[in-house]
Swiss-Prot record:
Belongs to the herpesviridae portal protein family. It is found in: Virion; Host nucleus. GO terms for biological process: chromosome organization. Keywords: Host nucleus, Viral genome packaging, Viral release from host cell, Virion. Residues 592-605 have a biased composition (Basic and acidic residues). This is Portal protein. Forms a portal in the viral capsid through which viral DNA is translocated during DNA packaging. Assembles as a dodecamer at a single fivefold axe of the T=16 icosahedric capsid. Binds to the molecular motor that translocates the viral DNA, termed terminase.
């Protein structure tokens, strides 16, 4: 799964003292958490907003648009305007009665056409750049930052296919302008240069997957090194991890949430195990017993014996005696049997008038004595058997403890028993597992193996007994823990990256947006360290949430081109610009003509700085 092949020279440079940083079981789990493998909760959806490359796309768009539209001179704009005005004057003869309105409509038509042409040229070509595929992934950059605080980067050459695309982009930006105006040509040329730099930078740097990189720490030189496909690559350590006793602890949001995430995940796992165990059908062992054999005997006697069979009567007596657990019940059964049997006896004492007890009384006395003697013998026999079993139990317990001590000694540190290596590994894993974040099965095994745990019902002495026994159907609650984890995710991401929530009128959060601190913390290192886009200016938090159309309007309104056009409008149409009457003003090209008095009252504006440069 992981590409960890490092060449021989690199491995020699690392030495035996190198501490592995990634991939390790802990670091891989951090990336798996970001992918939603463990306890994905609602609060983690904010991370999807965090890794959205829309803010970086707006930054690139703002840079290209601002740089291109600002690369024009006052002389170019004036030349294009004079050229346009000359064409209009040839087609439309001048009329002094409507000269002011004519000038206003002419200049408004030219300025609007210029704005639309520039916007179409810029947006069409910038969109091609933004929506073309690049090898540099902003999403992977955010994954590395949130998981480890370090970002590996690989430099790669520009492909021939990309060179062809850049050449075709030059043809679209420079050679196909409408009218071949100077302003459009200058803007198109600068757009091509800026776009070429952006495309080459975004396609010459590659952020690999977390499964393709090996990162190690060299204590001797106090540096972190990264390897990709056997060769050393750049590694940007933005948030250095803490290393103590060979254990690496990253300074990242996911590392801080790790404990709580796995507590929630193991609770959900425990709840699922309990659900599966408690919903299983009850199981019972069915076998033949001697308790119900008397029913077959009674049925056989009922079919084959006479109506009054002594064997059946005696068997019924025994059955009724076995079903009664109290002395009064036994007495009633005996009384009933004697009453039935006395009716068939001939009482000689009563017949011949001899004194003494009657036959019924003698039978009753005989039967009672016999039954009591049988019960007494049975009870004594049960007590003797219980005493024997207790002695046997104590003997076997001593043997078991002796065997456990011998087994523990053989499985302890330094034991070389190959047959016991597998149980030793299992016992060691169960002993080292974290009860809160470890595997549920291993945690249960650890608890059962603990000498201080009393998880089973047992009777070890004469005075101990089981007070209660039951089957528990407990399922641990996970809803509250999931809710707490959601709030913890939100709090961690909001406070680490200084995100700003956007809510509706009811106070419900709709989405989150980048603040100025978020741009400095997250977007700044990506722009200047990873992508190496030094000419690009960081986008403001206002532009980070605006749509492309709103960004275009804002950038054009504050651009050099808009200022030049506005200045030309004030000089060419002073009445409409100042709000006064519609005076007639000559074009700027006719510099020797006199200006009207109301125009002289206000000093003419000097060309902005950089005009003609």
């Amino acid at each position: 799964m992981f590409n960890m092949n490092v060449d021989e020279s690199a491995s020699g440079a690392l030495g035996s003292s190198a501490i592995p940083v990634h991939p390790t079981p802990a670091s891989v789990r951090l990336f798996e958490i970001l992918q939603g493998k463990y306890a994905y909760v609602q609060g983690q959806t904010i991370y999807a907003n965090l890794r959205n490359p829309g803010v970086f796309s707006r930054q690139v768009f703002t840079h290209l648009f601002k740089r291109a539209i600002s690369h024009c001179t006052y002389d170019d704009v004036l030349h294009d305007w004079n050229k346009f005005e000359a064409c209009i004057q040839k087609r439309w003869p001048s009329d002094d009665s409507c000269a002011s309105r004519f000038r206003e409509s002419t200049f408004e038509s030219w300025s609007t056409t210029m704005k639309l042409t520039v916007r179409d040229l810029l947006t069409t070509n910038i969109y091609r750049v933004l929506h073309s595929r690049s090898v540099l992934s902003y999403e992977r950059y955010v994954d590395w930052i949130c998981a480890t605080g370090m970002v590996p980067a690989v430099k790669k050459p520009i492909t021939q296919e990309l060179h062809s695309k850049i050449k075709s982009l030059r043809d679209r930006c420079v050679c196909r302008e409408l009218g071949h105006e100077r302003t459009i040509r200058s803007i198109g040329t600068e757009l091509y240069e800026a776009t070429r730099e952006i495309i080459e930078s975004l396609n010459s740097t590659f952020i690999p997957q977390f499964t393709e990189v090996t990162i190690e720490y060299l204590p001797g030189s106090d540096e972190y090194v990264a390897y990709y496909c056997g060769r050393r690559i750049r590694l940007h350590v933005l948030f250095p991890p803490a290393i103590f006793a060979g254990t690496v602890t990253f300074d990242s949001p996911v590392q801080r949430l790790y404990q709580n995430i796995f507590m929630c995940y193991r609770t959900l796992e425990h709840a699922k195990i309990c659900q599966l165990l408690n919903t299983a059908p009850l199981k019972a062992i069915v076998g033949h017993g001697g308790r119900d054999m008397y029913k077959d005997i009674l049925a056989h006697l009922e079919q084959n014996s006479q109506r009054k069979d002594p064997k059946k009567e005696l068997l019924n007596l025994l059955v009724k005696l076995s079903e009664n657990k109290t002395i009064s019940g036994v007495t009633d059964v005996v009384e009933e049997f004697i009453t039935d049997a006395s009716n068939n006896l001939v009482d000689r004492n009563r017949l011949f008038g001899q004194p003494g007890e009657t036959a019924a009384q003698g039978l009753k006395k005989k039967v009672s004595n016999t039954v009591v003697k049988c019960l007494t013998d049975q009870i004594n026999e049960q007590f003797d058997q219980i005493n024997g079993l207790e002695k046997e139990r104590e003997l076997y317990l001593k043997k078991i403890r002796s065997m456990e001590s011998q087994l523990q000694a053989s499985l302890g540190p330094g034991g070389n028993n190959p047959a016991a290596s597998a149980p030793a590994a299992v016992a060691a894993e169960a002993a080292s597992v974290d009860i809160l974040t470890g595997s549920t099965a291993s945690a249960i095994e650890k608890l059962f193996n603990s000498p201080s745990a009393s998880l089973g019902a047992r009777v070890s002495g004469h005075n101990e007994s089981i007070l209660n026994s039951f089957v528990s159907q407990y399922i641990p609650p996970s809803r509250e823990m999931t809710k707490d984890l959601t709030e913890l995710w939100e709090s961690e991401l909001f406070n680490t990256f200084k995100l700003t929530p956007v809510v509706d009128n009811q106070g419900q959060r709709l989405y989150v947006r980048y603040s100025s601190d978020t741009i400095s913390i997250l977007l700044g290192p990506f722009t200047y360290l990873v992508a190496e886009l030094s000419p690009v200016e960081l986008v403001t938090d206002v532009y980070a949430t605006l749509g492309i159309v709103e960004i275009i309007d804002e950038l054009y309104r504050s651009s050099r081109l808009a200022i030049y056009i506005e200045d030309l409008g004030r000089k060419y149409c002073p009445a409409s610009a100042t709000g006064g009457d519609h005076g007639i003003r000559q074009a700027p090209s006719a510099r020797g003509d006199a200006e009207p008095d109301h125009a002289k009252s206000k000093p003419a504006r000097d060309p902005p700085p950089g005009a003609g440069s």
